[in-house]
């Protein structure tokens, strides 16, 4: 393979956002080795690199699709939205880590390195176009997530969560790799996604039993990363045991990266096997919506409740993936953008509450409104938006997602989604009711000893700043849903692999 300076620059420009983050990792390591008063600069470099990376990605959205590194990486508007979403989620999660590290006195450098490495892995995964790059970047994201989940080494629950996540994650990765090896063999030794599709057509393997076996392995591997039923067993334990700020991070980033991977593989490699993977994914999505919401009702831990809530939420996302057209993908991405604000806003609120009280029990939130009306209001708005209460952003996002699913003929999935959304409102409203409980009615000692917060509007606390941004997004972004949809649809129309 012949390389020249011009092609090197062209290829490098396509991954410039990731290169910026890699450079920030090197700078962070150097600062950690050379500077004593390093805390400010570590956070400054991390946040600045993410902002610059997002800015570069915004400019790349307008460009024509580009295949770089001999076709191994694809840059287009579709995966650009996913890359921006991952970088933006990390940008909102760093303030959560700042507050958590300050209160728990944990090492800052390692936390930021793992977080940025996971971000880089997720962003590369969104544009990966061959099996080797997909697997390497997926493992980069996964390994960093394992390390983050067990970061509080003195916490037994955190160690248990990391071990379960590692073992289950390793098993799912090996299943996915096995599916990839079948694809490689059946396609005649091809590794790039479009070439695999062409190879399967040429070898007339699409009607064989082997393709069904490949689909089962690949769906199982991706379903684990997305916490879809029945591959969700690790999720509640990891959510409960890992640091809350860490859970906030990979509850969003891993799902965004997983959705990007699912859409790219199913819409490219298995485009001629629509009936097979549509049926399997629809069954998994329906099970996720039902089990996630019904089991969430019984939970007493806030983090476990959010774990099952996230399982049901990813079931809703799958409606857009199963639709398999530009409208379905546009609705999925629109809801994903709203979900970032809703989910991170909720996790930011419970992170702050946990740092001030040291409890995760749902009952201990009783009477919070009397002690901290702003935090209580922000948490209530985020939860209600997750439930899809109008006129919050979650309502408009779900409405558009279900409408596109209905148009695509997914009547059963949409009906189940509507029914389970009503169920989810029950357990979200139950928490809101506890929050506004009158003092001394059902309040516990945690709330009675709770220290009233300062004014959020003038607060210098980074986590409170993240809360404000997320709550504004989850509350008011639904108002501008039409412009958001128009931008997403226009961006998707420029992508080369979307089949209308």
From Swiss-Prot:
Its EC number is 7.1.1.-. It is found in: Plastid, Chloroplast thylakoid membrane. It is a multi-pass membrane protein. InterPro entries: NADH-Q_OxRdtase_suN/2 (IPR010096), ND/Mrp_TM (IPR001750), Ndh2_N (IPR045693). The keyword Amino-acid biosynthesis does not apply. Keywords: Chloroplast, Membrane, NAD, NADP, Plastid, Plastoquinone, Quinone, Thylakoid, Translocase, Transmembrane, Transmembrane helix, Transport. The chain crosses the membrane at residues 14-34, 41-61, 78-98, 116-136, 166-186, 211-231, 242-262, 277-297, 305-325, 335-355, 376-396, 409-429, 467-487. One of its GO terms (cellular component) is chloroplast thylakoid membrane. NDH is composed of at least 16 different subunits, 5 of which are encoded in the nucleus. This is NAD(P)H-quinone oxidoreductase subunit 2 A, chloroplastic. It comes from Anthoceros angustus (Hornwort).
């Amino acid at each position: 393979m012949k390389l020249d300076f011009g092609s090197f620059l062209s290829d490098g420009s396509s991954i410039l956002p990731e290169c910026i983050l890699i450079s920030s990792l090197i700078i962070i390591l150097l600062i950690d080795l050379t500077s004593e008063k390093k805390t400010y600069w570590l956070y400054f470099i991390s946040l600045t690199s993410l902002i610059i990376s997002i800015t570069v990605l915004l400019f790349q959205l307008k460009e024509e699709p580009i295949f770089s590194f001999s076709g191994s990486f694809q840059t287009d508007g579709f995966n650009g939205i996913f890359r921006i979403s991952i970088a933006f989620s990390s940008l909102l999660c760093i303030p959560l880590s700042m507050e958590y590290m300050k209160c728990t006195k944990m090492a800052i450098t390692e936390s930021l390195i793992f977080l940025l490495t996971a971000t880089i892995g997720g962003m590369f995964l969104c544009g990966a176009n061959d099996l080797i790059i997909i697997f390497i970047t997926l493992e980069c994201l996964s390994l960093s997530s394992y390390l983050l989940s067990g970061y509080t080494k003195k916490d037994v629950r955190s160690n248990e969560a990391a071990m379960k996540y590692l073992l289950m994650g390793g098993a799912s990765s090996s299943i996915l790799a096995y599916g990839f090896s079948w694809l490689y063999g059946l396609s005649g030794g091809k590794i790039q996604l479009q070439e695999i599709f062409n190879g399967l057509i040429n070898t007339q393997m699409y009607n064989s039993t082997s393709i069904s076996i490949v689909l089962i392995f690949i769906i199982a591997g991706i379903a684990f990363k997305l916490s879809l039923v029945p591959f969700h067993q690790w999720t509640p334990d990891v959510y409960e045991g890992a640091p809350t700020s860490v859970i906030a991070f990979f509850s969003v980033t891993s799902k965004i990266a997983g959705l990007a991977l699912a859409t790219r593989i199913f819409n490219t490699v298995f485009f001629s096997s629509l009936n097979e993977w549509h049926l399997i994914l629809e069954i998994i999505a329906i099970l996720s919506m039902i089990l996630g919401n019904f089991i969430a009702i019984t939970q007493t831990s806030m983090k476990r409740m959010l774990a099952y809530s996230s399982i049901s939420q990813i079931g809703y996302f799958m409606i857009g993936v199963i639709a398999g057209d530009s409208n379905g993908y546009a609705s999925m991405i629109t809801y994903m953008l709203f979900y970032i604000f809703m989910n991170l806003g909720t996790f930011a609120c419970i992170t702050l509450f946990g740092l001030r009280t040291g409890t995760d029990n749902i009952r201990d939130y009783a009477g919070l409104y009397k002690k901290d009306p702003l935090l209580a209001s922000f948490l209530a708005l985020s939860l209600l938006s997750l439930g899809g209460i109008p006129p919050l952003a979650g309502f408009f996002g779900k409405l558009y997602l279900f409408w596109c699913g209905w148009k695509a003929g997914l009547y059963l999935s949409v009906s189940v989604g509507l029914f389970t959304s009503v169920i989810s409102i029950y357990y979200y409203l139950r928490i809101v009711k506890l929050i506004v409980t009158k003092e001394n009615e059902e309040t516990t000692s945690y709330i009675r000893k709770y220290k009233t917060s300062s004014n959020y509007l003038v607060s210098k606390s980074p986590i409170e700043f993240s809360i404000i941004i997320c709550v504004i997004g989850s509350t008011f972004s639904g108002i501008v849903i039409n412009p958001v949809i128009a931008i997403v649809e226009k961006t998707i129309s420029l992508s080369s692999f979307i089949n209308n």
